[in-house]
């Protein structure tokens, strides 16, 4: 995936990237075209809101979506919606185009309506409260326990050696985030089945636009959640997750798929792994 920092070329992009490999606006903006022409059929796009007026970049983002669908028949698999946030030596208030929580929520909601098939990503730079709000509006992918500095996962980061790209507002562990999602009634999914089954590009688009992908997503979410609960979760998270799985399994509409999912969930409890539709 790749994000275009800003779609406005003159007096904006070129001012932010005057030199270096990223200074070529056309080459950077057309990265997705080159990727898809080279055989990569799933791409992700995004724009860093706050560097320019949000209306301009929002329209640029949707035009980018429209272009990819028109040219390749496949829109972006994911859309990221980062916004200017504070980091080392950076104050978000110094950017006159930084956006409020209300505008941010509106952007998320309209993208979800305009591009219903895409996965929408929000990072840990957003607070817990902000993440909760946009989950209700269309965000489908979030992270937990993230580090934003070079080598951040290798060792504990010292206070006087901070190289973070941005401050992490949501500092909860993965287990805490999963527990929170379960309390909110969501199904935390660790599924990567579409990639592993080759359901990418035009195959994915046909499935998702017809709604048939629902026959895979729900059961796969429950099975991958079950694996997480068995292998990594705290006891409290595990109990909440098992209750949700029991409830959601009964809601699988296709009887045959429900039967297979129940069988696979029992196999996971017995120690087997890696089931998928």
Question: Which residues make up each language-model segment?
Answer:
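Short, small-residue-biased leader/transition segments that mark boundaries at the very start
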Residues: 2-7
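A short alpha-helix capping/helix-coil boundary motif
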Residues: 9-12, 87, 108-112, 154-158, ...
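Short Asp/Glu-rich motifs
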Residues: 12-13, 54-56, 153-154, 200-201
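Glycine-rich tight-turn/loop motif centered on a GG-T
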Residues: 13-25, 92-100, 160-167
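Phenylalanine-focused residue identity feature
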Residues: 25-27, 49, 58, 72, ...
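Conserved C-terminal portion of the radical SAM core fold
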Residues: 26-90, 100-129, 136, 141, ...
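Radical SAM enzyme core and accessory elements
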Residues: 129-140, 146-277
């Amino acid at each position: 995936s790749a994000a275009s920092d800003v779609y406005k070329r003159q007096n904006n992009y070129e001012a932010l990237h005057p030199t270096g490999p990223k200074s070529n606006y056309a080459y950077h903006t057309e990265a997705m075209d080159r990727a898809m022409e080279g055989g990569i059929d799933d791409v992700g796009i995004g724009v860093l809101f706050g560097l320019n007026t949000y209306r301009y970049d929002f329209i640029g983002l949707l035009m980018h979506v429209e272009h990819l669908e028109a040219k390749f028949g496949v829109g972006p698999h994911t859309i990221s919606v980062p916004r200017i946030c504070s980091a080392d030596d950076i104050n978000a208030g110094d950017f006159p185009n930084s956006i409020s929580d209300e505008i941010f929520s509106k952007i998320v909601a309209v993208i979800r309506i305009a591009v219903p098939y895409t996965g929408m990503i929000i990072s840990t730079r957003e607070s817990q409260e902000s993440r909760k709000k946009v989950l209700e509006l269309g965000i489908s992918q979030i992270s937990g326990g993230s580090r934003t500095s070079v080598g951040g996962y290798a060792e504990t980061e010292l206070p006087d050696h901070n190289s973070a790209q941005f401050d992490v507002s949501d500092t909860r562990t993965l287990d805490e985030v999963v527990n929170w999602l379960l309390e909110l009634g969501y199904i935390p999914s660790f599924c990567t089945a579409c990639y592993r089954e080759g359901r990418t590009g035009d195959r994915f688009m046909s499935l998702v636009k017809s709604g048939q992908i629902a026959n895979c997503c729900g059961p796969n979410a429950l099975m991958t959640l079950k694996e997480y609960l068995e292998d990594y979760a705290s006891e409290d998270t595990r109990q909440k997750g098992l209750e949700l799985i029991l409830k959601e399994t009964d809601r699988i509409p296709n009887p045959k798929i429900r039967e297979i999912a129940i069988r696979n969930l029992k196999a996971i409890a017995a120690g087997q792994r890696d089931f998928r539709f």
